[in-house]
């Protein structure tokens, strides 16, 4: 951190001093602000924040005496902090203390330091204050009283309290890097190496300009470009061959002499062909069907928006109807405002128009019996009534006869005698009597004159098989009849369902919308292709009209040279660019006022024309203001004598 002086003051570089800059933050926190008189106002560093008091110092109101007094107090505080933090327990503290005291005394008692020239910046003149926490704005040539050295003895309790925070303090050290950077900058500006670099840069720029001004000429077109390609040669040879074939064919046909009946047959064939063509044309004309035109609502591009709008209206109507229903349900007495609209809804009217052929009021009204019948009792009663009504067929009565075979005596066999003897000897219980056959019991009940009837098992099985076959056949017939009835009912139901669905469904089939959508997609593809071609043509036109790169470079260089010549002319005349610009604007304003005064009678006519043709008036208003570049070019063409006269 340095305190700058004016350039003309003697010893300006030597009189500057550094005030405790940190060692590690020399390069990063060296930002300085230069005022108009050469005063350097450094930024506040960590040491300044540590040493500065907790009050704002106003540079316009504080006097030099109060500043020096504050400096002495800060010096005393810094000494105490350094002594307490560094040398409270070190045996070599006496030597370090003496060295630090010498450095501080040499800094604060330096007689060669000049007075700091502090001037109020423009910001302070306007009423704004600036906080300054650095030490380089303080005067150093004011006589300072001799300070009393601090006493070396302190109570042990104070040493212990200080040692708790003294280890975390960073001790700053002075440095002279800012002076070194300023000296290096001055040496670099005045060194011959910089002049050599400038000379090389100017030489390189001249070579580039000469290279840009060089003229180019196109080389002649090579001879092989005009020679035909192999493909073109082959195409020409093929065309010559076909021409020769056609010519020879025509020659042969011209030499041929046809008979008279061949010409007659060809004429007949041609007449028949013409008749067929006329007949087919008439058939095509008669067979043309009257095609239905596509409605405009489908071809309209805003169909989707209309559908969305209709859906939104439908939702609003539903919400309003729900609110009306809620009010009608909540109020016990229906008022006149809550009565239903006598005019039916659109959906109801559409349903009545489409489904008017269906019967809604049927004459047959079935009665519902709430009592569940006793099906088992009813079935038994039905069985009894059926048994009574059944017709009984009288059985065939045979005349009774008596067979005498039972009275015959059979001779006993020896095996039968043995078995009977064993049965008598064995003490077994008497065997159970065998059941008598039905035929025998029937015969016993009959009289002696009746003939017994015997039904065999085969007859019984045959009857049961016939009965089961008849039952199966009846069941099959019933199932077939039920299927036919069910099929008819389902067909009728499906027809009614499809009719109702078509009447209630607002969407159209794919066949109706397919052609319109196909046409719309084709139109969109055609439109995109046209836009793409138009963009390509615009790109080609921009590329063709754009100047070459060397032309752009030459134009920019010429513009820079004109601007530089204009600035040099102003410097030679002793004028500034801002002054000339202000003068030019002032003269132009005067000229505009004069032209307005002259053209005032024509104002009404111009306003009428602008109202009639607003586009032309807009174009004229856009063309009137001149660009600043044109103004600069006009001023650059003026001579230096005119510029001097303006001054």
Curated annotation (Swiss-Prot):
Native source species: Homo sapiens
Protein name as catalogued: Protein FAM161B
Subunit structure, as described in the record: Interacts with FAM161A.
Gene expressing this chain: FAM161B
Keywords noted in UniProt: Coiled coil
GO biological process, any: cilium organization
Annotated Basic and acidic residues bias: 590-602
Renumbered residue ranges of the record's region Disordered: 1-39, 89-110, 135-167, 332-352, 388-439, 583-647
Residue spans of biased composition, Acidic residues class: 91-105
Tissue/organ expression: Ubiquitously expressed.
